[in-house]
Amino acid sequence: MSNIEERVKKIIVEQLGVKEEDVKPAASFVDDLGADSLDTVELVMALEEEFDTEIPDEEAEKITTVQAAIDYVSKNQ
C-alpha cells in the first residue's frame, strides 16, 4: 500500500467514522460508507489540507469512491 493510499484511507476513517477494514478501493462514500453531502465536502477539504492541494468543485464531484480519491491525489501531487 502506497503512502498516499494509507493517508487517504486514514482521512476517510477519521472523517466518516468508519472502520478501516470497510475502506476498500471500490467503496462508495455515500452508498457503502454512509456519507452524506456534507461529509463528502468535509472529506474533500480534509484531502486538500492533508495533501496541500486545491480540488476544484467539478473534480470533487467525481471523487465518489475510495479509489477515485487515491487516484486524484496521486495524479495531482
From Swiss-Prot:
Q: What is its main location?
A: cytoplasm
Q: Does the keyword Thylakoid apply?
A: no
Keywords, in A-Z order: Cytoplasm, Fatty acid biosynthesis, Fatty acid metabolism, Lipid biosynthesis, Lipid metabolism, Phosphopantetheine, Phosphoprotein
Q: Where in the cell is it found?
A: Cytoplasm
Where does the record place the modification O-(pantetheine 4'-phosphoryl)serine?
S37
The annotated pathway is: Lipid metabolism; fatty acid biosynthesis
- Report what the Swiss-Prot or TrEMBL entry states about this protein's PTMs: 4'-phosphopantetheine is transferred from CoA to a specific serine of apo-ACP by AcpS. This modification is essential for activity because fatty acids are bound in thioester linkage to the sulfhydryl of the prosthetic group.
Any one Gene Ontology cellular component term annotated for this protein: membrane
Q: Name one GO molecular function term.
A: acyl carrier activity
Give GO BP annotations, semicolon-separated. Answer: lipid A biosynthetic process
**Residue intervals of the Carrier domain:** 2-77
Instruction: Enumerate the InterPro entries for this protein.
Output: ACP, ACP-like_sf, PP-bd_ACP, Ppantetheine_attach_site
Family in the record: Belongs to the acyl carrier protein (ACP) family.
List the PANTHER family hit by this protein, alphabetically. ACYL CARRIER PROTEIN (PTHR20863), CARRIER DOMAIN-CONTAINING PROTEIN (PTHR20863:SF76)
Q: What does this protein do?
A: Carrier of the growing fatty acid chain in fatty acid biosynthesis.
- Descriptive protein name: Acyl carrier protein
Which species?
Shewanella oneidensis (strain ATCC 700550 / JCM 31522 / CIP 106686 / LMG 19005 / NCIMB 14063 / MR-1)
